[in-house]
Design a protein with these regions (language model features):
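Short alpha-helical elements of helix-turn-helix
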Residues: 6-10, 30-41, 52, 63
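The alpha-helix within a helix-turn-helix
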Residues: 55
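Amphipathic alpha-helical interaction segments
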Residues: 10, 14, 38, 127-130
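N-terminal leader segment of winged-helix/HTH proteins
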Residues: 1-30
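Charged, amphipathic alpha-helical coiled-coil/dimerization segments
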Residues: 20, 48, 52, 70-133, ...
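Short, locally clustered residues in the helix-turn-helix/winged-helix DNA-binding domain
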Residues: 16, 41-45, 59, 106, ...
Length: 137
């Protein structure tokens, strides 16, 4: 039988759990969690994603996205705007307040990532990022 600690699927799941826990910890004082941070990050990007695109990119159920978007919108951090390419759907964009909070949150997440990956050299971090991107996308 294979040793669980050497199975790639288990290692990726464990790394995700550890990373999410670290992100949630540093985002607590901003009243964000990893998932709401991810939505805010995409809303602050130039992509202007629809809720469906958010769900696909984040591998979440549509109802989970609605709850996340509603929560961020209630806080004045994002807003729904009609999609100029499809009036039947909305794009999700950040507000100025959302942009400011995202900048603060992004800094906290970057520092947490650096701490979590401190055992790796910068070259190893770049290699890890590249490999994970290939697997994820």
């Amino acid at each position: 039988s294979a040793d669980l600690a050497t199975e790639i699927e288990f290692l990726m799941a464990r790394a995700r759990a550890v990373g999410t826990a670290h992100a949630n910890q540093v985002l607590t004082e901003l009243e964000l969690k990893a998932r709401s941070y991810a939505v805010l990050s995409l809303a602050a990007s130039a992509a202007k994603p629809t809720q469906r695109e958010l769900a696909e990119f984040l591998s979440l159920d549509a109802s989970q996205i609605v709850a996340l978007v509603d929560g961020l919108q209630d806080r004045g951090l994002i807003r729904r705007e009609p999609d100029p390419n499809d009036r039947r759907s909305n794009v999700i964009v950040s507000t100025p307040e959302g942009d400011e909070l995202y900048a603060r949150a992004s800094d906290k997440v970057a520092r947490a990532e650096a701490a979590s990956l401190s055992a790796l050299s910068l070259e190893e971090r770049d290699q890890l990022r590249s490999l994970l991107s290939r697997v994820a996308f």
